[in-house]
């Protein structure tokens, strides 16, 4: 059979009070989940598999239908995130409008968290939970043979089917094939704060052992690929002249030893790459940052979230302000760039002064860049459950949206102490307080190496400041 994997466009993403520039950044990343899936299926089955990144190309539904029909797809598999349900449903309809299509399958985070709601969407033939490689291959084999695909692990076909457990293909991440990035137009992907050359994302692990209340990742046990497997993938990227790498693990430094081993392998292979990683501040020490810099690390993204120990404790971050300041001071001393992520409108911010305290702390911390967003609790997180228990949040709006996705839906904020409009005004103030400082502008100008850097940084800054 001919399977076309589609990443839907991002024209109607749920408004989550994250600046659109930050949301848009992730839409310019390659669809790693689909690349991994397609590479595995092409290696293990006889079916023909291709990828359509409708997000990268910003395709209208009619254009999606034409592309599906032109490729003569029998089955369309759609990557599904809850915040993109409007575009997911429109992509389902676009697929059904193609004469060649017999089945439409949904998979991805939304199907893991809300399988029954996903299966109930009109036009959907089946839903896959967990890692889709083996379930999707079994589905294709069954449909090709004309068999009813009932009882397949990880697959929900009929609306009366029991909800299957999510499938985990293997805990050995080294057994996964290196994603074939040539299945998409890999030269077109960019990062908001990238280094300017060809860019891609790499995942080296699954899950996170930490317990932040606003995140649903803690439900997944941490497993990491070996340094050798990671560097094999980096070598494959370099072979395509991709040298700007963003490690998008939930937490890159789960242990310092693992980071040291990865860096040692990069250095031993003399890989000429620059890279960014997402890390926690606790455990960061001089030896670690020095090793990371020697291995090509240009920038570290830290989730700081709050400017007080009380705020960090409420979110169960498991870090302290002292650890935050030590990590940023060390990076500054050793010449490694930093990005700090902050939330405003959290349960411990009960008045304007509390929010201003977070904003002022972000300025005083002096990262190279900062990303602010308004706290938006999502169903499935402990913070959302706490909001339900306290009467701050309601599940019904999300349930209605999942049944009937509409573009005017807006995710709930923690509005116990502020209105949405008040929080948006404070968000604007936060960005202006940081990025409109003369010291920040002059510092960025001093770091320019070529004219293209000026254009890239100016574009990023304008999007952060004005695209709201």
Where are these regions (language model features)?
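Acidic, low-complexity intrinsically disordered segments
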Residues: 1-239
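Radical SAM enzyme core and accessory elements
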Residues: 2-5, 12, 46-48, 65, ...
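A structural motif corresponding to the C-terminal end of an alpha-helix
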Residues: 37-50, 99, 240, 269, ...
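Short acidic/polar active-site loop segments enriched in Thr and Asp
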Residues: 47, 74, 243-245, 298, ...
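Residue-level detector of structured alpha->beta connecting loops
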Residues: 72, 123, 296, 335-337, ...
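Catalytic cores of alpha/beta
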Residues: 115-120, 288, 349-364
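Radical SAM [4Fe-4S] cluster-binding motif and immediate context
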Residues: 174, 178-348, 360
């Amino acid at each position: 059979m001919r399977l076309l994997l589609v990443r839907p466009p991002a024209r109607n993403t749920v408004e989550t009070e994250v600046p659109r520039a930050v949301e848009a950044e992730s839409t310019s990343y390659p669809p790693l989940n689909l690349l991994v899936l397609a590479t595995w299926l092409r290696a293990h089955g006889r079916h023909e598999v291709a990828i359509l990144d409708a997000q990268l190309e910003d395709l209208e539904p009619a254009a999606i239908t034409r592309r599906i029909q032109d490729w003569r797809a029998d089955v369309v598999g759609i990557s599904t995130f809850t915040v993109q349900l409007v575009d997911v449903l429109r992509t389902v309809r676009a697929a059904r409008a193609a004469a060649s299509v017999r089945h439409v399958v949904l998979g991805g985070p939304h199907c893991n968290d809300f399988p029954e709601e996903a299966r109930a969407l009109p036009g959907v033939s089946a839903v896959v939970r967990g890692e889709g490689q083996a379930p999707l291959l079994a589905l294709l084999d069954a449909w090709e043979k004309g068999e009813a695909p009932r009882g397949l692990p990880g697959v929900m076909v009929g609306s009366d089917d029991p909800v299957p457990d999510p499938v985990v293909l293997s805990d050995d991440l080294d057994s996964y094939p290196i994603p074939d990035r040539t299945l998409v137009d890999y030269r077109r992907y960019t990062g908001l704060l990238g280094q300017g050359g060809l860019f891609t994302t790499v995942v080296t692990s699954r899950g996170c052992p930490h317990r932040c209340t606003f995140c649903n990742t803690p439900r997944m046990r941490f497993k990491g690929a070996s340094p050798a497997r990671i560097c094999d993938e980096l070598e494959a990227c370099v072979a395509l002249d991709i040298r700007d790498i963003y490690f998008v693990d939930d937490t890159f430094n789960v242990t310092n030893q693992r980071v040291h081993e990865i860096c040692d392998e990069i250095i031993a292979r003399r890989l000429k790459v620059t890279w960014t990683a997402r890390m926690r501040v606790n455990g960061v020490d001089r030896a670690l940052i020095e090793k990371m810099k020697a291995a090509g690390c240009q920038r570290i993204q830290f989730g700081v979230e709050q400017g007080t120990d009380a705020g960090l404790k409420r979110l169960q971050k498991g870090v302290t302000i002292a650890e935050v300041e030590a990590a940023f001071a060390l990076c500054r001393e050793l010449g490694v760039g930093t990005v700090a992520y902050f939330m405003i409108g959290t349960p411990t911010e009960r008045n304007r002064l509390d929010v201003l305290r977070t904003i002022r702390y972000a300025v005083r911390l002096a990262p190279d860049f900062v990303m602010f967003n308004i706290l938006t609790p999502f169903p499935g997180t402990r913070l959302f459950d706490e909001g339900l228990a306290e009467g701050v949040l309601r599940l019904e709006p999300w349930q209605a949206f999942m049944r009937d996705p509409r573009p005017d839906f807006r995710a709930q904020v923690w509005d116990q102490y502020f209105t949405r409009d008040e929080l948006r005004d404070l968000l604007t103030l936060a960005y202006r307080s940081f990025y409109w400082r003369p010291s920040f502008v002059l510092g960025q100008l001093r770091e320019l190496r070529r004219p293209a850097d000026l254009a890239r940084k100016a574009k990023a800054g304008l999007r952060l400041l004005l695209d709201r």
